């Protein structure tokens, strides 16, 4: 019996990430970079949602980015398959028949990056391990971490936005979901005695106006990434929950302190430069591989507390303060 033939090297690669969250795209960045490293001559396109698409601007691994309209994801995938005819498709997204369509129409594909996840393996690492087993990336690249490319001009702007601060502390209070909201933000900011900056959307900044922290101006996503990069270069720290902006901070080299409650830090942690604080680590209701099926997830109804997620409240301001760098002596 003859050996199965090796598929020809792809010349057109499509990566599909339509899971909906900014953090989901950041966790998929190692997939994009590993594919480019294995197939440097191939053109690589990414189909994703705004606003995260801007994070791929200036990334040399990416030939083009296509934006999908929310609610029309399957149509966007079908249109891209028909228009571009990729040789290889890798998708993080399976809902609405997207995986079936890719398998039917693409010569080569990897459509289930969520298969049999161990409860303690980081999501990005799991993606890469599966792709290596499918022989579409180099096995040596299974340890890649998310990385966002900034221009020199953007980095200069980030330095200017943060001013002359030594070892700056940036707080990212927005949670995205009620179940991830940390109740101790103002206590932390007060304890930092004016050192902290708050980053967020205009509504969040308005809520903090006159409060115990300084406000960064409203920033675009890439401007925010540049500020985070400046924090990293100056030995500062970015503090926040399990959110997309925090993943952006880690991906531009900032040290992070992540506050984790319902999501397990062992799977969704922010990366090697930071520390992830897990509230109520032994919670019996936490489902590491099925977080959206947790009893608390959608309505933030905690079995242990009538006033909000007990796991988030369990992370005290003192635990965070212990990880905040002290300004250098002048």
Where are these regions (language model features)?
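Nucleotide-sugar donor-binding patch of glycosyltransferase catalytic domains
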Residues: 117, 211, 251-330
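Short amphipathic alpha-helix
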Residues: 25-37, 51-52, 188
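Active-site donor-nucleotide binding/catalytic segment of nucleotide-sugar enzymes
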Residues: 15, 19, 114-115, 145-209, ...
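Conserved nucleotide-sugar phosphate-binding/catalytic loop shared by glycosyltransferases and other
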Residues: 19, 41-76, 280
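Short loop/helix-cap segments at secondary-structure boundaries that form the rim of catalytic
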Residues: 54-60, 99-104, 204-212, 248, ...
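Conserved nucleotide-diphosphate donor binding/catalytic pocket of glycan-assembly enzymes
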Residues: 62-147, 167-172, 263-266
């Amino acid at each position: 019996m003859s050996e199965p033939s090796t598929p020809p090297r792809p010349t057109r690669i499509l990566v599909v990430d339509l899971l909906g969250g900014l953090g989901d795209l950041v966790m998929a960045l190692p997939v994009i970079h590993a594919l480019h490293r294995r197939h440097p001559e191939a053109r690589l396109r990414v189909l994703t949602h705004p606003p995260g698409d801007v994070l791929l601007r200036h990334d040399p691994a990416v030939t083009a980015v296509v934006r999908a309209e929310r609610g029309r994801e399957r149509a966007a995938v079908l249109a891209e398959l028909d228009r571009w005819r990729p040789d290889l498709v890798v998708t993080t997204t399976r809902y609405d028949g997207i995986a079936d369509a890719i398998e039917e129409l693409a010569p080569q594909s990897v459509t289930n990056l969520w298969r049999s996840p161990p409860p303690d393996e980081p999501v990005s690492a799991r993606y890469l391990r599966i792709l290596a087993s499918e022989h579409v990336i180099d096995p040596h690249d299974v340890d890649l971490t998310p990385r966002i490319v900034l221009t020199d001009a953007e980095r200069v702007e980030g330095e200017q936005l943060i001013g002359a601060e030594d070892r700056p502390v940036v707080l990212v209070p927005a949670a995205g979901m009620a179940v991830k909201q940390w109740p101790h933000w103002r206590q932390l900011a007060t304890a930092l005695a004016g050192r902290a900056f708050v980053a967020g959307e205009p509504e969040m900044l308005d809520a903090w106006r006159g409060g115990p922290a300084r406000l960064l101006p409203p920033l675009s996503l890439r401007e925010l990434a540049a500020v985070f990069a400046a924090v990293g270069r100056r030995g500062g720290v970015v503090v926040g929950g399990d959110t997309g902006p925090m993943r952006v901070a880690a991906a531009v080299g900032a040290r992070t302190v992540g506050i984790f409650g319902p999501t397990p830090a062992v799977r969704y942690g922010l990366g090697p430069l930071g520390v992830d604080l897990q509230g109520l680590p032994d919670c019996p209701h936490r489902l590491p591989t099925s977080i959206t099926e947790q009893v608390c997830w959608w309505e933030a109804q905690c079995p242990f507390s009538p006033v909000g997620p007990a796991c988030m409240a369990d992370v005290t301001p003192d635990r965070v303060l212990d990880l905040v760098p002290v300004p250098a002596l002048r």
